[in-house]
């Protein structure tokens, strides 16, 4: 008897030793949450009950290296042949069979299975074998109690399941970089709490909607995301009144770090994630980054630090945040950008203008907190 399933393969999880079961369990939870389907843990793979549309959801789950959609069948050659014939597309000219065998007690090795199943397909269809550049590949996995046969294979996004590395606060500005940084943190096993600082004097409804759209897109990779909308107006005005123009951006970002730390403490987060890319803008020089990050008690993780803009844009397009990020809006940084900003800030020149922790605490307390995604 054949059952249509998806068979999931992972990469790094397989080398996690004693923690492997924990990582697998987290991935299974993510698959169940994303698909709503029955999931079974098999050694070295995960089996998912199939339903229409499963592929698009599975492709966005961190921790999956690739998955095949086909049939689970009984562990004998005749059943495998029948399944192989069933997974072939209607139109093709050439094919090959690719067998892997984790069950060494199966009476044939991988080469023999390839040869026998291939000969059966030739006999039944009249198609030709092409081992170099086939139109169709039939993958066969010989396991302990069953075999999996499929010709549709989909690449996942790799990485680790969300949550295995703990929780982080990710600063979301509304630009191209910060959503990509949040995604990269998710891909390394972090559960993201998103934080956006907004200025209520601007086009708040449009800004709010754009940030919500970005969070919803990111939620496709994580599941539900908690989004903090932090009112920044009072802190911003204090910085404008107190700080020389060339230092405002550095002071402003240090203030964001302190507020992010307050939220992290509340949410049980262990680090702050930023969209910084080294030397991309004035605030992202090594000197300025050192001064800005020193305001955080927690580790600050910049996943994009070594990427150029083209690399970041390519990921943004792949995860479908790019078109949202380029929607026009005024962000609260615009007030802070000086004509000649400081690129080599010194901590002693910055801290003497600070001292608005009460306003920062008040802003965090007055944050709007949204639950985004499903």
Swiss-Prot record:
Signal peptide: none annotated. Residues 52-153 form the THUMP domain. ATP binds at residues 171-172, 196-197, 253, 275, 284. Its main location: cytoplasm. It is found in: Cytoplasm. One of its GO terms (molecular function) is ATP binding. PROSITE patterns: THUMP. Pathway: Cofactor biosynthesis; thiamine diphosphate biosynthesis. GO terms for cellular component: cytosol. It comes from the Archaea. It catalyses: [ThiI sulfur-carrier protein]-S-sulfanyl-L-cysteine + a uridine in tRNA + 2 reduced [2Fe-2S]-[ferredoxin] + ATP + H(+) = [ThiI sulfur-carrier protein]-L-cysteine + a 4-thiouridine in tRNA + 2 oxidized [2Fe-2S]-[ferredoxin] + AMP + diphosphate; [ThiS sulfur-carrier protein]-C-terminal Gly-Gly-AMP + S-sulfanyl-L-cysteinyl-[cysteine desulfurase] + AH2 = [ThiS sulfur-carrier protein]-C-terminal-Gly-aminoethanethioate + L-cysteinyl-[cysteine desulfurase] + A + AMP + 2 H(+). GO terms for biological process: thiamine biosynthetic process; thiamine diphosphate biosynthetic process; thiazole biosynthetic process; tRNA 4-thiouridine biosynthesis. Keywords: ATP-binding, Cytoplasm, Nucleotide-binding, RNA-binding, Thiamine biosynthesis, Transferase, tRNA-binding. Its EC number is 2.8.1.4. Disulfide bonds: none annotated. Catalyzes the ATP-dependent transfer of a sulfur to tRNA to produce 4-thiouridine in position 8 of tRNAs, which functions as a near-UV photosensor. Also catalyzes the transfer of sulfur to the sulfur carrier protein ThiS, forming ThiS-thiocarboxylate. This is a step in the synthesis of thiazole, in the thiamine biosynthesis pathway. The sulfur is donated as persulfide by IscS. HAMAP family: ThiI. Belongs to the ThiI family. This is Probable tRNA sulfurtransferase.
